[in-house]
Amino acid sequence: SKYVYLAVFNNPSWIPIAFAKVKNHIAQFKKLGKNVLYLPVSYTEYGIQPVGNPFILTSKGKVTTIISNKKVLQSMTLYRKYPLFKHVQDIAYRILGAKFQAVNKPTFEDSVSIYRIDKWGTRGEEINIPPLGNKYRYWRLFQPEWSHCNVAEITFVERDSHLRNQGKVIGLPRSWNNDPNTYKEAAFDGDLLTFFDSALPAGGWVGMDFGHPVDIEKIIYTPRGDGNTIGIGDEYELFYWTDHHWASLGKQIATTIKLEYTEVPSGGLYFLRNLTRGKEERIFTYVDGEQVFW
């Protein structure tokens, strides 16, 4: 081809955004955006075809080529499939100060404080609970501060069975603006895009009546967000870029708020898909145990 194009990833296709003429096997591009990952491509009768390895043009103008190393394998812990944006961060902080409480009285009088959320984040969290010495029938998330008790999902895991324990949803009866889509049941519906939005700015709460005292070993929760964290029960598939195409590293059904992959080629470009729901997905590299989206 007389021309080479540079493409960027646009969920889920590569879209050419710049071109240059090839002279003596060299194509020179000018005025490219920095801190961007590009893929060299050409147009053929079969459509867009990669003609080189993806690379990052850093903020300092350095070119860093991305090549998967199949000889050096790594483990990978994944929490998201799409980058985090400011509008999500502005909501997620509301989880700060919330408390998980347990009691055997429906009024929650003399309740035991199980855990206080002292740091905010946009991904799900697991709380491992040591043996308490007592079992409790009523468990809840209580938010004393100005947050409307915003939470997307709560899961209570029983100690003996190590399985999710399901009871009767309890909590404040109404939501903000009386929106039926944000009632207390939304905190237990398995959908990360729905959330409880208490009618009270402070003092909101939501939880479970298990019908009898239970021993909970773990609480898993996800703050209100964008639905792009890992959803329990959803099926995911991880891909990596090799030999000019995406190759699968296997499917998993999420049992908690993160995915664990082993024997992953290191130094590469990756792509996580939710096969159950959702459309927003983004490529990433993996640096120092963290996903870096492009």
Residue ranges and their predicted role:
Residues 2-13, 93-98, 151:
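Short, ordered, surface-exposed loop/turn motifs in non-cytosolic proteins
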Residues 2-3, 35-36, 41, 60-62, ...:
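Glycine-centered loop/turn motifs
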Residues 11-24:
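Short, acidic Ser/Thr/Gly-rich low-complexity loop/linker segments typical of extracellular
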Residues 16-17, 53-55, 115-118, 128-129, ...:
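Beta-strand-rich interaction surfaces with strong enrichment in secreted/lumenal proteins
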Residues 22-31, 257-262:
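Short, surface-exposed beta-strand/beta-hairpin micro-motifs centered on an aromatic residue
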Residues 26-39, 43-45:
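Short Pro-Gly-centered beta-turn/loop motif in secreted/extracellular proteins
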Residues 44-71, 284-294:
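Structured interaction patches on ligand/partner-binding surfaces of diverse proteins
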Residues 70-110, 121-251, 255-294:
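Aromatic, loop-rich ligand-recognition surfaces of beta-strand-rich domains
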